[in-house]
Amino acid sequence: MDLQVQIIXFLLISVTVIMSRGENVLTQSPAIMAASLGQKVTMTCSASSSVSSSYLHWYQQKSGASPKPLIHRTSNLASGVPARFSGSGSGTSYSLTISSVEAEDDATYYCQQWSGYPFGSGTKLEIKR
């Protein structure tokens, strides 16, 4: 097989992989929520098709900062994340819960299927002061 044919085949495979990545849409609910200090909150992540619990992750993005890992593999806290955060779910339905909201939790939260894939639509948590 000559080089041109190899390059074309590689490009076709790459396009197929990239297009298949976009098939599963993650929709988060609610889009915006407000909570008082100490309140328990739960936000959801719904997938258009089933996601393995080993590959569902949550990120926290504070204003002006990059997203930071929060929970990996559905329910495992990332290093340094407080125990008030927890994750659960399976199949097409996942959730992130904060058992007692603190002021520093004011951020946007994103779910993600597989590392490197697009984030879900996001939930912005606003803290009532």
UniProtKB/Swiss-Prot annotation:
> Which residue ranges are recorded for the region named Framework-4?
119-128
InterPro entries given in the database record: Ig-like_dom, Ig-like_dom_sf, Ig-like_fold, Ig_sub, Ig_V-set, IgV_Light_Chain
- Establish whether keyword Disulfide bond is in the entry: yes
Q: Region Complementarity-determining-2: what ranges?
A: 73-79
What lineage is on file?
A: Eukaryota, Metazoa, Chordata, Craniata, Vertebrata
- Complementarity-determining-1, as annotated region: 46-57
Q: Where is this region: Framework-2?
A: 58-72
Q: What's one Pfam family the UniProt record gives for this protein?
A: V-set
**Which keywords annotate this record?**
Adaptive immunity, Disulfide bond, Immunity, Immunoglobulin, Signal
Which intervals of the chain are annotated as region Framework-3? 80-111
Q: Give any extra note attached to this record.
A: This protein, in which there is a deletion of two amino acids at the V-J recombination site (after position 118), is synthesized but not secreted in cells that express and secrete the normal kappa chain S107.
**Where are the annotated segments for Complementarity-determining-3?**
112-118
Give me any GO biological process, just one: adaptive immune response
One GO cellular-component annotation of the UniProt record comes to:
immunoglobulin complex
- Which Cys pairs does UniProt list as disulfide-bonded? 45-111
Residue span of region Framework-1: 23-45
What start-end ranges are recorded for coiled-coil regions in this protein? none
Q: Does the keyword Signal apply?
A: yes
Signal sequence extent: 1-22
Protein name in the entry: Ig kappa chain V-IV region S107B
